[in-house]
Every structure is written in C-alpha cells, then in structure tokens.
C-alpha cells in the first residue's frame, strides 16, 4: 500500500468534484435489471428452469440478477444497450420454444392435526406481489454493487455521486433506497386502516403510540450510524465530507425518518394523501432554498459548529423525507389486493387497474420533474442530491414509479396465476414460482445485507489498493464480493432466518 496520508487524499479526490452523467444513460443502465428479470421470467414461465432449485439454477439466477447488474456498471458501462440486447435475444429465443409442462409435485402426507393449518386458508387483505420483490431486490443489488465498485477505476466517474449539481447512478440509488423503504412502510398503515384501528383512538394517543413504535426502528439505525462514524474516524478511512457532512452518514438519515413519518401519519388526518404531503414538504423546502440564504448556507457555510459541520445531512433529510412519503403513497395502491375494498371486480380487472394507476402516477411525477427542470417551459431548476432539492425528489420518485410499472407488466404477462389465486396456499405457491430465490433472499434481509455490504466494502478498501487495480483484478474482487453477499442472503433465507434492524 502507498503512503497512508497521500493514498487517503487520492481516494477522497477520486470521488470528489464529479458532475455525473445524463438521465438517459442512467435509464439505459438501470433497464438492464428489468431486462434480466424479463429473461428470468421467460425461463421460469416457459421452461420451469428454476424448479427444482439446483446448483445450476442458483448459478444462472446469480448470473442473471446480480451478474448482469455488475456488468452494466463495469465492463458494459459504455454500451448498456448492447447488454440489454444480449439479454433480450435469449429471452425471445426461449419464448419461441415449446413450453415445458410442469410435472405435478407429489404431495406429502399431512398429519391430521396439521391439516387445518395446511388447508387453503383465506387470502390476506395485503399481498406480497412478485413485482415488488423484484423491484426491491434489484434496487438492493445495484446499491450493494455500486458502493464497492465506485472505489475502482473500472466504475465510470459519471456514475459516482456528484459534488453539487447533476444526476448520477449512485445519486439515484440512495434516493431509491429511501423510496423503497417508504413503499413497504405503507403496509402497516394499510393493515391498520383495513382492521378499523386507524381512528380508534384520539390524535394525541395515536401520535404518541406511533412515536414509541417508530423508536424501535430508529434506535438500531442510529446505533449503526454512530458505529460507522466511530469506525471511519478511528480507522482514518477516506470520506467525502460534502456528501453528508463531518459526522453524519446515511444510517442517520434512515434512523431519523421513522419518527418524522409517524408525525406526518397523524397529519394525514387533515391531508389524506402521502403524495400531497410529499409535495408539500418538497415544495416548501425548495421555496426556502430559493428565497432565503439556506442554499448558500448548505453549500458554502464554514463548518464552525455541529449543525454547520453536518449541514448537508441535516437539510437533505427534508428531501429524503419527501421521497419516503411519496414511496409510502405508492405503496398505498400497489400493495393492497383490491384497490377498492370489498370490490367485486375480477382479478384481471384489478390487475389492469393497478397498471393504469401506476402508469398515471408515473406520468404525473415525470411531468412534475420536467416542469421543475425545463428551462423553456418550467422553472429551470437543477438536480442536487447534496441538498436533496425538489428536482431530485421528483426525479427519484418518477424513476421508481416507472420502474415499478415495468416490473408489474412483466408479472402480468408471465405470471397471471398469482393474481388469479383463490386461497393463501395457492397464492404462496404462485408467488414462489414467480420470484427469483436470489431476489427473495435480498428482500428478506435487505438492511442486514446492506450493512454487510458496507462492512465488506470497508474491508476491501483497507486491504486492497483499489485505485491501481487492473480491470481483471477489479472484476475478480467484485464477483467474489457479490457472490459472498448473495450467498449469505440465500443461506439466511434457506435457514428461515430474518434479521430485523
């Protein structure tokens, strides 16, 4: 390893003063994940390739859903459309082959005392839809791959986080992580609403109980934030101060979200839409940035006290809160089994309505993003992940809503049986058939895998001179790293272990 002080400075310079790339290129790169799911779906729906789940099936699952994403940000970073074509071509070929008939599974004898539990069972009011698993799994994999890959020269600088203004893959990734968290946070709200508990208690008691519940989620994340802070300072690890500040890190952002979301959940009694709350927060924040000295403070203030030292993390939190609320609003219509409670519409009609609503919201968020950034017809604002301003919020939400739509369309085409299931057992079997084991594993312990990815990233950076690594060495390290993360995730899933942080 080179001289420690100079090498640390080189590492910091390597991720500093970057301006990002185009939104179009980011869309081409991220579409690889959806196209890989398309190929996986064709293999499974037409050939039942992943049943039984053999070592070969796992290898192909890993190569498609992790390997393709890794290639898209490294060796194929300059030609993502070619990589998409290389995935689409075999998908078309497999689709044209005669489908393989699924051999009926031999049912095991069920003890008499277990038959009542094993029998079909009623469908839950909330479902775990395959496209949500694929969406969240892809987001987690891209995030985990990028946080280590960014330290190597093979990873394009235009994909790394920008200094102040601009768009990049990693800027999108951090916002997507928060959006995804908001998406699943809609589940307890929906269950509370469905069971009639939403208005059972007074506002004050409701808020206090929600705040207490939120602390159960916040405290572990805040502890992780302090551990990361102490580790970075204690090990003299390279850090990009203008990303979040001197002491702040992403775990603090995640940790402070639950109590604020609990407050806004009570405000929802007055404004019954998380999307409206998201826009209210985002627009108010942007107005303050434009009409006061807040923007200058966040970007240029001297770091003289605790707040100014962490000004990026503190004020960007407002933007991330808006993203979380928008994700929660999306979850309110993509998670429920029926968009209208007690609806008598057929499963096909419900499914088509979901696609239409998702498409409409994708159009709304995209239109608002264009309005905020267009110089001729809009406000001409620039995206800034550093401040998490309104254009950044709208970009992240628009991208993720459209990405969700893409995964939902793939689901609809290849796995309609899930939506037609009449009982819980049949639905669970259809869900398992329609989802990748790798994706399910990443979903199940997403935050734990993300934490492990951070630990392994630190380990690699402390033991390997990443700046001088050759392309072959880089790919070797990234493949081993990705395989290790995936192996741990799948092993935890195989042993039915869920780590909740």
From Swiss-Prot:
It comes from the Eukaryota. Residues 101-121 are annotated as: Disordered. Glycans are attached at residues 17, 117, 496. It is found in: Endoplasmic reticulum membrane. InterPro entries: PIGW/GWT1 (IPR009447). Its EC number is 2.3.-.-. GO terms for molecular function: glucosaminyl-phosphatidylinositol O-acyltransferase activity. It holds the Pfam family GWT1. Its main location: endoplasmic reticulum. Keywords: Acyltransferase, Endoplasmic reticulum, Glycoprotein, GPI-anchor biosynthesis, Membrane, Transferase, Transmembrane, Transmembrane helix. Probable acetyltransferase, which acetylates the inositol ring of phosphatidylinositol during biosynthesis of GPI-anchor. Belongs to the PIGW family. This is GPI-anchored wall transfer protein 1. The gene is GWT1.
């Amino acid at each position: 390893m080179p001289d420690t002080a100079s090498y640390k400075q080189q590492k910091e310079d390597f991720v500093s003063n970057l301006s990002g790339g185009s939104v179009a290129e980011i869309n081409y790169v991220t579409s690889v994940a959806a196209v890989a799911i398309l190929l996986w779906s064709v293999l499974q729906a037409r050939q039942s390739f992943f049943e039984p789940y053999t070592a070969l099936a796992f290898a192909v699952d890993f190569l498609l859903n992790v390997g393709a994403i890794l290639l898209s940000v490294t060796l194929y970073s300059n030609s993502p459309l070619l990589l998409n074509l290389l995935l689409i071509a075999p998908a078309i070929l497999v689709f044209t082959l005669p489908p393989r008939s699924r051999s009926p599974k031999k049912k095991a004898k069920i003890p008499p005392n277990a038959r009542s539990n094993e029998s079909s069972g009623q469908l839950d009011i909330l479902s775990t839809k395959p496209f949500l698993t694929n969406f969240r799994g892809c987001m987690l994999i891209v995030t985990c791959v990028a946080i280590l890959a960014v330290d190597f020269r093979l990873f394009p600088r235009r994909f790394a986080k920008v200094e102040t203004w601009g768009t990049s893959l990693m800027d999108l990734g951090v916002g997507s992580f928060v959006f995804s968290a908001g998406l699943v946070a809609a589940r307890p709200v929906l269950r509370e609403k469905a069971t009639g508990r939403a208005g059972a208690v007074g506002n004050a008691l409701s808020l206090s109980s929600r705040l207490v519940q939120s602390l159960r989620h916040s405290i572990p994340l805040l502890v992780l934030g302090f551990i990361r802070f102490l580790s970075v300072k204690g090990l003299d690890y390279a850090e990009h101060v203008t990303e979040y500040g001197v002491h702040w890190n992403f775990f603090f952002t995640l940790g402070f979200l639950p109590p604020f979301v609990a407050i806004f959940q009570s405000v929802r009694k007055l404004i019954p839409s998380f999307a409206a709350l998201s826009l209210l927060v985002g627009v108010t924040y942007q107005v303050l940035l434009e009409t006061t000295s807040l923007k200058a403070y966040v970007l240029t203030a001297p770091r003289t006290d605790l707040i100014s030292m962490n000004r990026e993390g503190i004020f960007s939190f407002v933007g991330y809160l808006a993203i979380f609320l928008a994700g929660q609003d999306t979850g309110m219509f993509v998670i429920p089994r029926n968009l209208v409670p007690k609806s008598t519409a057929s499963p096909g009609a419900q499914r088509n309505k979901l696609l239409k609503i998702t498409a409409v919201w994708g159009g709304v968020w995209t239109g608002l993003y264009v309005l905020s950034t267009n110089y001729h017809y809009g406000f001409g604002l620039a995206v800034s992940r550093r401040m998490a301003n309104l254009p950044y919020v709208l970009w992240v939400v628009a991208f993720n809503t459209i990405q969700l739509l893409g995964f939902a369309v793939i689901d609809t085409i290849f796995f309609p049986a899930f939506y037609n299931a009449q009982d819980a057992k049949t639905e669970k079997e259809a869900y398992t058939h329609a989802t990748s084991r790798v994706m399910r594993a990443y979903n199940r312990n997403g935050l734990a895998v993300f934490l492990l990815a951070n630990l392994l990233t630190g380990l690699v950076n402390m033991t390997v001179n990443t700046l001088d690594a050759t392309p072959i060495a880089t790919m070797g390290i990234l493949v081993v790293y990705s395989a290790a993360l995936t192996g741990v995730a799948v092993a935890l899933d195989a042993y039915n272990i869920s780590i909740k942080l």
